[in-house]
Amino acid sequence: MKNVKNILITGKNSYIGTSLKNWLMREPDKYKVDTVSTRDDSWKEKDFSQYDVVFHVAGIAHVSSDPKMEELYYKVNRDLTIVTAEKAKVEGVKQFIFMSSIIVYGDSSSSKRVIDRNTIPTPSNFYGNSKLQAEEGIKHLESDDFKIVVLRPPMIYGKGSKGNYPKLAKAAQKLPVFPNIDNERSMLHIDNLCEFIKLMIDNKESGLFFPQNKEYVKTSEMVKLIAEVHGKKIWMTRIFNPVLRLMFGIGIVNKVFGNLVYEQSMSDYDKVNYRIRLFEESIELTEK
């Protein structure tokens, strides 16, 4: 088939990898997509030379503070990324797309926190540090013939996603009241991410990118919206706010009610609109 892009996704059963494959396969005349598991070493025998693009999403995605996990995080998130990129380059792949994360900038904050292009990454745990070291470990491989894209998305959500979103969605359907705290988060719906990656592939991009939804999200407004989609009523109250503010040192409180946003202009992409889902629609799609 003429002009078909051959794409290999590492991370066979990952939420993002599976979502991207389904997204691209809607246009089978443009994309051929394979996936490979990296859980054992058998992937090293795979011939990468048949692929134009490797999308590397294999990794440990959710933060652990268990020191016993630290070595594994570096082995999987850093070392595996570097070895995969080296293999891709040696075997003639033209573009390597790496899923990093906003986590390289550290945790959310009890006060407003806006990341701009001049913000220096300061990871606060070994998950963030392993991602940042992976970025740094593949930089030197870039050349005219081997383009590298690094994506640092914020929290990704969508139907079937993992992490904090489904926990909040469950709370929205069960709790009669929820704290109304003024916070702002950058988020990214899975369809917007997949469309963005498609543009990276189509335009043979290289560089560092910060895709996010058009709108910032206030946690209480998101929970209210989720409840409404399910026909539930939830009362937003500020009565718990003083107690919650004292608890911002606790990880889960900070993750749910903290502030962490990208400055909006960082996420624009050459006037091309990859944000095909606005926030309200994205919640309806996720919850239906």
Predicted regions and their residues:
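Glycine/proline-rich active-site loop of Rossmann-fold NAD(P)-dependent oxidoreductases
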Residues: 132, 145, 156-167, 199-209, ...
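A conserved pocket-lining segment of Rossmann-fold NAD(P)-dependent short-chain dehydrogenase/reductase
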Residues: 66, 167-188, 192, 199, ...
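Conserved Rossmann-fold NAD(P)-dependent oxidoreductase catalytic core, especially the SDR/UDP-sugar
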Residues: 82-126, 149
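N-terminal Rossmann NAD(P)H-binding glycine-rich loop of SDR-like oxidoreductase domains
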Residues: 6-26
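NAD(P)H-binding glycine-rich loop region in Rossmannoid oxidoreductase-like domains
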Residues: 41-87, 104-107
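Short alpha-helix in the Rossmann-fold core of NAD(P)-dependent oxidoreductases
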Residues: 74-81, 97-100, 130-131, 186
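Catalytic helix-loop patch of NAD(P)-dependent Rossmann-fold dehydrogenases
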Residues: 75, 110-151, 155-156, 177
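Mid/C-terminal beta-alpha module of Rossmann-like enzyme folds, strongest
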Residues: 196-253, 277, 283-288
